[in-house]
A protein has these predicted regions:
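Hydrophobic transmembrane alpha-helices
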Residues: 2-88, 92-93
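Alpha-helical transmembrane segments and their cytosolic interface
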Residues: 11, 167-172, 183-190, 202-251
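Alpha-helical transmembrane segments and their lipid-water interface positions
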Residues: 41, 45, 94-98, 151-155, ...
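Membrane-interface alpha-helices at helix entry/exit sites of multi-pass transporters
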Residues: 80-86, 167-175
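Alpha-helical membrane-spanning segments of integral membrane proteins, especially the hydrophobic core
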Residues: 87, 123-144, 173-177
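Transmembrane alpha-helix/helix-exit interface in multi-pass inner-membrane proteins
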Residues: 91-115, 144, 148-152
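Juxtamembrane/transmembrane-helix interface segments of polytopic membrane transporters
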Residues: 98, 102, 106, 189-198, ...
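Membrane-interface interhelical connector segments
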Residues: 101-135
Length: 251
């Protein structure tokens, strides 16, 4: 007997239809951005004021939200959620592969010094970088799940409120949803990881979540004309017309 929690055939068909419709590079770039931001998050940026905690992951974190905004604009909120959670599953698979690789015996090429000797401390540090910590993986996964749902919902609500279809509206819905969702993402991670494991205060968590979200939002602002242009190309080429007719326009 099928469990009540199992996806219905219609939901599975919806997921399959969108993944068939979605340009392959969108999902590939989304997955790549998740992998890259998690690896780069291991490098904290120095020379910053005490109220700003930022890691190198911000160079890629905006990409995922920009792709969701583009997808929601063209294919709808449900499609944005499917894109996000599919990418999250692939990311977890890659995290597992990285963890397995860290357990393999051997030395990283970067652990060798000028004399050709492998330095155990550096080799162990590289293994740990790719292996990650269970609480960091858990926290980042919960954070991106929550912030993705939040981003896509806010994006749609802002679009309904503005009622127009131009770059100004696209930028507004993207900037508002991304700014708030990045804050939610950062704060969720801080509540799960930074406060209990690194001893942050709640004030530190909120302040750094807000300032970090601003830095990440600025990256999307810079590239928003490009993402808007891509959406317009999709519309001109009627990309996903059959999907829209079946799942969006029919509602």
């Amino acid at each position: 007997m099928m469990s009540s929690s199992s996806p219905s055939p219609s939901k599975l068909s919806h997921i399959a239809d969108f993944l068939h419709t979605c340009p392959a590079w969108v999902l590939a770039l989304f997955v790549g951005s998740l992998v890259a931001m998690n690896l780069l998050a291991n490098k904290s940026l120095g020379g910053l004021p005490s109220w700003l905690a930022l890691d190198a992951g911000f160079l890629f974190s905006w990409v995922a939200f920009a792709l969701m905004d583009m997808t929601v604009k063209r294919f709808g909120e449900a499609a944005g959620n499917i894109l996000a959670f599919t990418a999250i599953v692939f990311n977890l698979f890659i995290v597992l592969i990285f963890f397995m690789a860290s357990l393999l015996p051997g030395e990283w090429s970067a652990s060798y010094d000028a004399a050709g000797q492998s330095l155990p401390a550096i080799n162990a540090a590289l293994d740990q970088t790719f292996a990650g910590s269970w609480y960091v993986v858990f926290g980042s996964t919960v954070a991106i799940c929550v912030s993705s749902l939040f981003n896509n919902r806010v994006n749609v609500l802002v679009a309904r409120w503005l009622h127009r279809d131009n770059f100004g509206v696209y930028a507004s819905r993207s900037f508002i949803s991304t700014g708030l969702a990045q804050f939610v993402d950062n704060l969720t991670f801080a509540l799960i990881v930074s406060i209990p494991f690194f001893g942050w205060s709640l004030l530190q968590a909120v302040t750094c979540a807000a300032t970090g979200a601003l830095a990440e939002l600025l990256m999307e602002v810079v590239f928003s004309p490009v993402s808007y242009r891509i959406v317009r190309i999709w519309e001109a080429r009627q990309t996903g017309a059959a999907y829209l007719e079946k799942y969006v326009e029919a509602r």
